[in-house]
Amino acid sequence: SELPYIKQLFIPPFTGDNGTSYVAAKLGMPKTERLAPAYWGPAFAAESVEKNPQKFKLKYTKKEYINDSVAELLGQNKIVAWFQGRMEVGARALGARSILANPTQANLRDYINAKVKGRELWRPFAASIIAEKKFDFLTEDVNEPFMTKAIKVREEMAPRIPAVIHVDQT
């Protein structure tokens, strides 16, 4: 925290009204050391996605080496809809359902906001960073699995990833 009197702050992954029932139930449960992952939404069979890509105007392909294929597409400045397992609960896409794009291309940020998500152009995005590289990009040593905190990016790195830099350098 940038406030010296706050040593630690926990923000749950679902801070909206949908989190109230969770917290109420959690208060009646035995204490645990760690909050479980937020993947409590519905799961969909691969077959339902394979049968209906045209319904959503998507191009669906199944690859043996999906990570390599996605990296190649991102390198070509393509936008990838990532969908796996159960959906997250809450407002943040935490990796089970995410829109992936090349963070070096500011025009992709604007395109996703306007055409894909249909939201205001100023709305920020979050970057996924390999843990070993977080010190190269971030000003704090943090682990934010629920994307509940905005973290400042090192000044010298911001120009390298303009699509995920907000006006406040987070």
Task: Identify the residue ranges that each predicted region occupies.
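Flexible beta->alpha loop and helix N-cap segments adjacent to enzyme active/binding sites
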Residues: 2-170
